[in-house]
Amino acid sequence: MSIAIENNVALVTGANRGIGKAIVESFLDHGAKKVYLAVRDTNSTKELEEKYGDKVVTLQADVSNTASIKTLAEHATDVDVVVNNAGIGTPQSIISDDVEEDFLNQLQVNAFGLVRVANAFAKTLESNKGALVQLNSIASIKNFSQLSTYSASKAASYSLTQGIRTELSPRRINVLSVHPGPVDTDMAAKAGFENAAATSEISEGIVSALKAGDFHLFPDDMAKQFEKEYENFSNNIVTSDFSE
């Protein structure tokens, strides 16, 4: 199932900076009718509002709060493409006093946030024959030292993405799982990654992958190295139907 961004309405969580902001810009550059900017701080989208005018609509949303996401869905019933981009990640050793609190916080946003968004928008996306895009990571399939809790939360979100795809595909909803490597964002800088990919590589890749009807997207150079090694397992295990 494929969907073109042109003349469609999108919603992006965490739309005020980094990958989320780049997705908004790419969608509008490719002819999106309107993009909802779902953010915790509604004052953080002024730059996008000044640039795009009535093509963008800012809505308050917190993916760690179920009621907030339900309200968000009630205000965006015309949406065709929902991008769950909001996420958190901090360097954290597993062997530490505060690891449990840190891990729970990341699960609340990175894993349960996806569950909240998928549940809130499923009926709308079914009615509009739309798409759900989940920002996962190469850390979804490989645990990185000092990012172990982040990697585990993204592994959980990837597993959930597979389950969501199984449930939503029969309802004619396309699901796209995006797995970038380090991207030039505040999060990557804090983690000490160098030579990070430009945010536009991810956002432009999403536009193309949606049009192609793909399930996986490994958009940047490092991610493509993972894709090459992961492809056989993905084709034979992840996307296979073992119910037959």
State where each predicted segment sits.
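Active-site helix of classical SDR
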Residues: 118, 153
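C-terminal helical subdomain
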Residues: 177, 185, 189-228
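The beta1-alpha1 cofactor-binding region of Rossmann-like NAD(H)/NADP(H)-dependent oxidoreductases
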Residues: 59-71, 100
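Conserved mid-core segment of classical short-chain dehydrogenase/reductases
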Residues: 89-104, 146-149
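Conserved glycine-rich Rossmann-like NAD(P)H-binding loop of the short-chain dehydrogenase/reductase
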Residues: 28-47
